[in-house]
């Protein structure tokens, strides 16, 4: 697993920010870990965190879109593991495109913590499991909060 170029992850001071975490229930063990780590990071940064669950990754964009209207940032979490059909590609492309479009259309940061892996082992390695090198739930939260703070500063500078 490549970690080259990954910036050091530090919690920003997100006191006063409202962030929502939306987590898919498919691949529950992995998604629950992503969820717990994202929520823990958000609260440790001082953000007000609200939590929501959806069935699968395809349901994430519509809920994220609604929450983007009322929150400073939203974190989307899920896990899509490649199977034997092209369905994997359709789901991954659709979710990624949807989350990106929502962020751009609403100017609300969306932390994309949807794992798209070839194997369950790869997903576990990225989910913050004990001994894993990556923690995509916490990383998605930090990215969303950090971006919300940058946007807040830009908006304040505009007056």
UniProtKB/Swiss-Prot annotation:
Positions annotated to bind (2S)-2-hydroxy-3-oxobutyl phosphate: 84-85, 126
One GO cellular component term: cytosol
Domain of life (superkingdom): Bacteria
Gene3D superfamilies named among the record's database cross-references: Lumazine/riboflavin synthase
Binding locations of 5-amino-6-(D-ribitylamino)uracil: 26, 57-59, 79-81, 112
Substrates-to-products reaction catalysed: (2S)-2-hydroxy-3-oxobutyl phosphate + 5-amino-6-(D-ribitylamino)uracil = 6,7-dimethyl-8-(1-D-ribityl)lumazine + phosphate + 2 H2O + H(+)
GO terms of molecular function: 6,7-dimethyl-8-ribityllumazine synthase activity
Pathway: Cofactor biosynthesis; riboflavin biosynthesis; riboflavin from 2-hydroxy-3-oxobutyl phosphate and 5-amino-6-(D-ribitylamino)uracil: step 1/2
InterPro entries linked: LS, LS/RS, LS/RS_sf
GO biological process, one term: riboflavin biosynthetic process
Active site: 87
EC numbers, comma separated: 2.5.1.78
Keywords per UniProt: Riboflavin biosynthesis, Transferase
One Pfam family from the record: DMRL_synthase
NCBIfam families: lumazine-synth
HAMAP family recorded: Lumazine_synth
Family designation: Belongs to the DMRL synthase family.
Described function: Catalyzes the formation of 6,7-dimethyl-8-ribityllumazine by condensation of 5-amino-6-(D-ribitylamino)uracil with 3,4-dihydroxy-2-butanone 4-phosphate. This is the penultimate step in the biosynthesis of riboflavin.
Protein name in the entry: 6,7-dimethyl-8-ribityllumazine synthase
